[in-house]
Amino acid sequence: MRQSLLHAVDPSFDARSRAGLSPKHQVFRELLEVILASPATSIYGFYCHAGQSYASTSLDEASQFLSAELKAVNDAAEIAMSVIARMNTVSSHNIPFVLSVGSTPTAHAATPETKANLLSSLRGKLEIHAGVGSVSFAVMNPG
C-alpha cells in the first residue's frame, strides 16, 4: 500500500519560507521525480499556506497572497503532471491533484468572482481552507 502525500509548497521562494519548496527551486522537480517513482508513495495533492498574508492590510493585498498560493500549487501540479507523463508506468497518483490553499486572510479574499476567474486555469481540484478562520474573531480581535 502506498503512502499518500499532500506535498507542501512554498509560494514565496525566500528566507521567510513557512514550509515546502517553491516550484521555482531547481530541487523541486528532482524531489517530485523521487516521490513519483517510489512504489511506497503517491501524491494526493499540493498544499500552500501564505503565512505572510496575516500582515496584509487590505482585501487587495490578501487577494495577491491568494493568487501567489494558487500559482504555487498550480505550478507544482503542472510539474508533477509533466514528470508523470514522462514515466513509463501506469500512474497510481491522484489526478487531478487536490490543490489546497489558504490562510484566514486569503480565504476571506476568495470571493465567488475571484474563484470563478481562477478555477478555469487550475490543474486540479481546489480546496480553500481558512487557517484559524473558525476562531478568527478570538484570535484576530483579542480583548
PLM region spans:
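Active-site loop/helix belt of alpha/beta enzymes
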Residues: Q3-G143
